[in-house]
């Protein structure tokens, strides 16, 4: 993974929120880090209130905003001290948390803050970046994933066991951060979820993210995960009637119309041609995969679904996965 940082572009942004916008967009440009609407970023800023008094604010990405295109209006300013106090509570329901976040914003027209706003607030750095990097989740989703992370990064990452995003996760991270942090700490990994990096400059937080993910990608490459020679094929064309029939069957199972598009990217064909494809497709994927075979030309389906209770859901054309199918809104054959 390569850094997209450009000094000329960066110089166009003159303040901390501007730098937050810039590096957020850099993260959003790489779909192996975040998909549309995924991930979140924040910056801590001191601003004057209407009485001319300084107040500490957390500008955090608004829920649903896309990092690739986010701009200043996409960040919600929330009172930092209140967020930190919330992390000390024993319990906080989701409706209560949303109410506390919204009622402590300093801009009523701002979007609803990310559900991970409290987590961002508890990290003692000005800039915090969070992604769902493919390489990171690929490793953590394998057997002994936690140990693999330790082998790769040593004591440079704080490791948090999986828990659903929200108040409980923020509270756990707030406690574990101070238990595990050391002079070598560069980030925090949430197993089966993603990676946090942080620093007191936007550039350093971003560069930390890129470097740590690059290490994960290098580890995967060293395991020969993608070193497969694509067999020569005379004709890779997929009959449009086959596509239509496949879409119809999947839509029937899903109980709603589904959209299916075809791509023949080399890395996808290479993966689809592996002899142990079905085994690979059912473990460690950061996105959901289903296998279909058509004569001599296997293909695979990436399904954009929800992650539910630490289970990466996979849609297959069988009756037993009907509930999973209903969670899907888009099906893409890539």
What is each stretch, according to the model?
Residues 1-334:
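Glycine-rich flexible loops
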